């Protein structure tokens, strides 16, 4: 017995079949993982301080896929995964962007609004003569 196609599962999910939505997610998990890996590497998250792991991106991608279900229209002639791909990718990039924004806010000093610590040269080089 062959597995049902994405378009058929999407139609069932649009009618409220949660099992079909879960199968749709399961059958397309490979694409979600591949996309998560691409974004993880391209965003250089390995060396960042954002604390985002590939699993986080995969979860967001799965949510993106599920959000694509209600708007999919088979009569347009586009395959479901082609339609859902931007939803998946955007959900992942939104996570990265939002995390980066939160990271930037933590870096900003509330008193002077700068993203770095204000330091006087005299504090760094005490007792040194001025070069001016």
Segments (PLM) and residue ranges:
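Alpha-helical promoter-recognition and RNA polymerase-docking modules of transcription initiation factors
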Residues: 1-102
């Amino acid at each position: 017995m062959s597995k049902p196609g994405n378009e058929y599962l999407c139609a069932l999910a649009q009618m409220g079949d949660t099992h079909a939505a879960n199968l749709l997610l399961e059958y397309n998990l490979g694409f979600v993982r591949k996309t998560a890996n691409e974004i993880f590497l391209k965003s250089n998250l390995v060396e960042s301080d954002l604390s985002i792991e590939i699993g986080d991106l995969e979860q967001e991608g799965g949510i993106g896929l599920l959000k694509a279900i209600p708007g999919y229209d088979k009569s347009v002639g586009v395959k479901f995964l082609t339609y859902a791909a931007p939803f998946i990718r955007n959900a992942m990039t939104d996570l990265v962007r939002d995390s980066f924004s939160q990271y930037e806010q933590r870096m900003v000093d509330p008193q002077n609004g700068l993203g770095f610590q204000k330091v006087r040269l005299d504090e760094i080089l005490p007792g040194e003569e001025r070069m001016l």
